[in-house]
């Protein structure tokens, strides 16, 4: 359990035992450093080997960078556009897995960077991604058997780099179930 982070340094979470998770709570909005979670789990979110990060709220994620390399993450509390995650999500080659409760929607207002795959098996849910996507070169995908919507923008202004919304090579796909990819920019 981590309850309270602040400052601009780097926190690297150690590998943990299978079927365990780090629980991070409190309002960590003053944390502007980097929280790194990488290691053993090459199948983030696997029920046989869950080693994910559980955040109490969007504010528990801080306002720095969350670097994920083979670790899943989720939030206890559903957030809104007004309480969006403001941390930068940096996804490395082993990828990450958005876990949580089906039927819930999550809002991410921070940037996405890196070249890994962000996947989820959540059903009947939305992930609103309203931050800068120009530094992201990976993939957004969905596994499972229900509908999931990746919503880029939420009637918000788009950040573009040389006219591009994403970095080169981004892939939007459904590996199972049904994925919708919506774009809503002003």
Annotate the PLM regions.
Residues 1-186:
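Beta-strand-rich extracellular passenger or scaffold domains
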């Amino acid at each position: 359990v981590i309850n309270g982070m602040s400052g601009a340094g780097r926190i690297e979470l150690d590998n943990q035992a299978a079927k365990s998770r780090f629980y991070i709570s409190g309002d960590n909005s003053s944390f502007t450093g980097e929280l790194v979670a990488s290691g053993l789990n090459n199948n983030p979110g696997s029920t046989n080997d869950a080693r994910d990060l559980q955040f109490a709220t969007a504010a528990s994620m801080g306002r720095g960078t969350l670097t994920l390399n083979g670790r899943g993450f989720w939030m206890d509390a559903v957030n809104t556009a007004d309480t969006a995650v403001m941390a930068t999500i940096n996804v490395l080659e082993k990828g990450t897995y958005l876990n949580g409760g089906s039927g819930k929607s999550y809002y991410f207002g921070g940037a996405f960077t890196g070249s890994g795959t962000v996947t989820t098996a959540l059903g009947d849910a939305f992930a609103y991604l309203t931050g800068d996507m120009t530094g992201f070169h990976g993939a957004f995908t969905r596994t499972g058997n229900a509908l999931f919507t990746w919503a880029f923008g939420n009637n918000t202004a788009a950040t573009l780099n040389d006219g591009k919304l994403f970095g080169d090579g981004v892939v939007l796909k459904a590996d199972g179930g049904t994925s919708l990819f919506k774009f809503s920019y002003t």
